[in-house]
Amino acid sequence: MRLLLIHARSFSFEVRDKAVENPEPLTEELKRGSADNTLVVFTTVEENDNDSPSFLERVADDVLDVAGKVKASSVFLYPYAHLSPNLAPPPKAITILNALYETLKGKASIPVYRAPFGWYKAFNISCLGHPLSELSRTITPQESAPQRKPYTRDYYVIVSPDGSIHDPASYSFSERDADLKVLVDKEVFKRELEGKEQPRYIDYCLKFGFEWEPLSDVGHMRYGPYATVMLELLDDYSYQVAKSLGIPVFKVKGTNMFRLSDKAISEHAGLFGERMYITESDEELVMRYAACFQQFAMIKDWVLSYRNLPLGMLEIADSYRYEQPGETVLCFRLRRFYMPDLHIFVKDLKEAMDVGLRLHAKIFEEIRRIGRDYVSLYNVSKEFFDQNKDYLVELARREGKPILVRVLEGAKYYWVLNVEYHIIDELKRPREIATFQFDIGNAQRFGIKYRDEGNNIKYPVIIHTAILGSIERFIFALLDTAAINEANGKVPALPTWITPVQVRVIPVSSGYNEGAIELARRIEEAGFRVEVDDRDETVGRKIRDAETLWVPYIVVFGEREAKTGSLSVRVRGVGQVSMSIEELLNRLNEETKGYPRKPLTAPMLLSIRPPLP
C-alpha cells in the first residue's frame, strides 16, 4: 500500500463522474466533503495488499502516529490510484479501503472522513508547508505479523453402502478395497507412492502426437494430426454424453479472458486462489480456469422460468491454470487444457440432489465403458453432511462400495458438495478425472435468476460437472488403461471409435496401389478413418509401423485380395482373420456404434506425407 500524507490547512472534494465501471456506491454524504487542519491520506491499494487485521492496524497506527505529531484535528482517507503501477482490482481495493476506514475510526480519538473509490473528483488542498506536512509511506503485508488462516477442522470418514460410518484410521480394508486404501493413504494420511520411473503412458502420448510446446509457457501442449482427431472426437462425444442426461443442454462458446474489475469475476477468482493466469492490456484480465465466467455472464441475461429448469449449458472451454512448473504433467496437469464444462441450473438443492444421482450414474457409466472404475472423494460442508447423510449413503450404495467423505467444518465455500472421481493409475496413484459439485453461491453473485410458480424471483442452484473430466485427462485415462493392460501381458489398444487410424491398407507392391486405394475409398465412404501405406518399404516394415500406431485393422492387399475380394486382415489383439469388405465394415460399425465419427486429419496416402515426429 502506498500513502502520501499531506497536513492541510484545508481540504475539500466533490464527485464528478465515474472512473471505473463498478465504482463504490455513492451515498449523499460521499458526494462531497471538507475539513480543516486535517491529515489527508492519499491511498493506493496494491495488488498484494489484503484486509488482514494485522496489516490494516499497522497502516492505521502509522497514519495516526503522523496525525498526532502534526496535531491534526481529523484524518481524511482519499483513494488515489497514481502512487503505484501495481493496482489492486477495484472490488478488492474497495474492500480494503473500507476496512482501513473502519480500523482508523476504531483506533482514532479524532474524526475520520473518507472519499469514495472509483469516481473522478475535484479537490482543493492547502498544504501547511512545515517539515512534517508532506510524507510518504510504502507498507506491505509482509511487514506485518504473519496472517493466520481461518481455523477449520476438516475430518474424514468412510461411509459404507449399508449406512455405517467409520474412522479411516481404524477401518479394516478388504482386498476389494485396495483402490479406496490408496485414496485414503493420499488424502487422509498424506502418503502417496511416487512413481520412480516414467509412466508408460507418456510414450503413448508422444506416439499419437500429444507433446509439450517448447516455444510457449510451461505446461502448454501441442497436438499433431492424430492427437487432433482424438480431441475433436471427444469434443463431440462430450456434448453427446451431456444430452443423454435427459435435460435440455445448450452448447455455447465465448471468450477466455475476463475483467478483474468486475465484482463478480473478482470474487469468483478469489475463491479459486493463486493458480490464476493474470494478463494485462488496458486493464487487468484473468484467463478463465473453466467455463464458469462465460456461461454465468451469458445466462444472467436469459429470462428464466421454473418451467425451463433444469437446464444445461456446455462449452468445451480452453482453460488456464497457473500450475507450478515442476508439477506439470503431460496430458494430465497442464496450464492450458480443454474442459467440457457442463453447468446445470436447477430450482433448489432438492432438485440438484435428484439430478446429481443421474450425473453420478453417467460418470460411472462412461469410465466403465473403457474398462476402469472410480474411487470417490466426497467433499461436503458440515451442514450438508449432518442433514443429508442418507444421500451420501445412497451414492455409496449406487457405487457398490465404501466411499471416502471429507467433512469441512468452520469454513465457508460456494459449494456444499464437491465430488472428485479418481482412477488409480499404473503407478498406484489416485488421479482425479471427473467431478461434480452443488454450487449455492454463484447464482446470486452473478445475478442469475428465475421466476418460480408464484412469480417470485429466485436464485437457482448450479451443478458444475465435467462428466468425462478434461479432454486431456480422459485421454490420459485411455492411455493409462492401455499401459495397465500391457503391464498385464495384454496388447495395448484404444477403443476403435477414438483410434486415430481405424484401418490401414498395405499393398504388397506398387502394382496393387490402385486396388488398395479403391478399397480404402469404400471404407472411407462408410465413415471410417483409413490410410494407405503406399511407401516404397517392405510389407514387414509397413505392418510394424501400423502396429506401432495401434491400428485395429491392418489389411494386406495383393493378388489374392484383388481377385477374390476376400481380405487378409490382421486384427489387433486377435491375429490374422479372413473376411470380406462387408464383414470388415460390419465389425467397424459394431465397434463404433453410439460414438461420433470424424474424418482423417491427414492425407490418406502415406507416400505424400513428410515423416511425422
UniProtKB/Swiss-Prot annotation:
EC number(s) recorded for this UniProt protein: 6.1.1.3
Q: Where in the cell is it found?
A: Cytoplasm
Q: Which reaction is this enzyme known to catalyze?
A: tRNA(Thr) + L-threonine + ATP = L-threonyl-tRNA(Thr) + AMP + diphosphate + H(+)
Q: Where is the region Editing domain?
A: 1-147
Write down how the cofactor binds this protein.
Binds 1 zinc ion per subunit.
Cofactor list: Zn(2+)
Disulfide bond residue pairs: none
Indicate yes or no for the key word ATP-binding. Answer: yes
Give GO MF terms, alphabetically.
ATP binding; threonine-tRNA ligase activity; tRNA binding; zinc ion binding
Residue ranges, annotated region (Catalytic): 199-495, 200-495
- Single biological process term from Gene Ontology: threonyl-tRNA aminoacylation
- Listed binding positions for Zn(2+) are 292, 343, 464
Q: List the keywords (alphabetical).
A: Aminoacyl-tRNA synthetase, ATP-binding, Cytoplasm, Ligase, Metal-binding, Nucleotide-binding, Protein biosynthesis, RNA-binding, tRNA-binding, Zinc
Q: Which domain of life is it from?
A: Archaea
Give a yes or no for keyword Zinc in this entry: yes
State any GO CC term.
cytoplasm
Per the record, the major location class is: cytoplasm
Q: Which HAMAP family match?
A: Thr_tRNA_synth
- Family classification: Belongs to the class-II aminoacyl-tRNA synthetase family.
- What domain comment accompanies this record? The N-terminal domain is an archaea-specific tRNA-editing domain that hydrolyzes incorrectly charged L-seryl-tRNA(Thr). Catalysis of tRNA editing is performed by the charged tRNA itself.
Instruction: Describe the protein's quaternary organization and the partners it interacts with.
Output: Homodimer.
Task of the protein: Catalyzes the attachment of threonine to tRNA(Thr) in a two-step reaction: L-threonine is first activated by ATP to form Thr-AMP and then transferred to the acceptor end of tRNA(Thr). Also edits incorrectly charged L-seryl-tRNA(Thr).
Tell me the protein's name. Threonine--tRNA ligase
**From what organism does this protein derive?**
Caldivirga maquilingensis (strain ATCC 700844 / DSM 13496 / JCM 10307 / IC-167)
Name of the coding gene: thrS
